[in-house]
Amino acid sequence: SNYTLPPSTTLILNYLRSQDIKCFFVGGVIRDSIISSKPHEQGDIDIAIEGDALIEGKKMAQALGGVYVELDTKHGICRVVLKTDSKQTYFDLTSSNYGIATDLKDRDFTLNAMALNIEHIQACNQSHSFNLANVLDPFGGLGDIKNRIIKSVSETSIINDPIRTLRAIRISQRFRFQISEETSEQIKNSSSLITNV
């Protein structure tokens, strides 16, 4: 079955396809499109680029009349802010130099560790959609969405970045999903670290 992407992706897709670079939509944009039949315009859309995201981000901002913001030069992460219908949409670009599989392994929860090659996105009536068969899902995120469970990608997901605890709670409240036992245990074990953030 097909799932619709938020309208703001249309603008960016046309541009990315014209650039002949291998890139993927990752994380929340896929998750939200699957969970909600009418994906609302979310704050940001994550894009993993096999190449230098900082260079591509600058080019994108210039071509689309957006604002370029460098978030993490060392890891090649930047943001392009575009105005669409009086709203701002953030596109966060990451350099995925070691391939998309490595990129997903470093993500927080299985339901965010999914990717979609932009080549597999179809246009239909003014919007864009994708088929579940084309979603890269090495950690079982689709199954966890179906079962309404938040599960960390690895045993060290939370301890490596304690802020993810807050993200788990936020996702849990927003979608009324359960946090898995293993992930709850990780949260408990790293709760002392959150004060250091």
Regions found by a protein language model. Give the residues of each.
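Catalytic cores of the polymerase beta-like nucleotidyltransferase superfamily
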Residues: S1-V197
